[in-house]
Amino acid sequence: YLSEIDKAAYHYSSKYYNWDAYNPDEIAKVREQVDRIAANPCDATASAEMVSVEIPVWRLRNGQKVAGTAHVQVLSSIANDVKEIFTEIYNGPEQFPIESVGGYNWRSNGLGSNHSSGTAIDINPDANPQIDVDGTTVLVGNKWEPGVNPYSIGRDSDVVKAFGKHGWNWGAGFSRADMMHFDY
């Protein structure tokens, strides 16, 4: 599935990662909320810590980009950060289109996933697959084609830049490359 060039593209370029984005007060709030969830790991406990954030997005309609909104459920202490990130993506020169976006999703393994704590976001999963460690098996989604498929997230895209600026990790560098995934 992946050529050597493609494999290199899956590794997150740290040039957009902003270590200065870490705010100790914000991190303490996030840690406090995640600790509450960990103390009683269940959907009800986690759901009580989440908020729905309305975000500006570009949609594709008949091949044209049109303004719209979407909602993503995240941990309340990172809601403003999420709003800022998606506003930057929306205002970026790329006008990156978002077909679907997901955040909080309780998993049966509890806090084994950042989605269970509301600190992860997936964007356009059909066009931004998760690839197994073998580099060939697509676990979720379809072919990753930045520059060809408008929904695929390129490594130098406005999406990667905005999340990196705010100190989020891109799943592209995971052992199971997860192109759709960003986490705090």
Predicted regions: what they are:
Residues R36-A44, N109-G112, G154-R155:
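Intrinsically disordered, low-complexity boundary segments flanking structured domains
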Residues K83-V133:
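Active-site-adjacent loop/helix surface patches within enzyme catalytic domains
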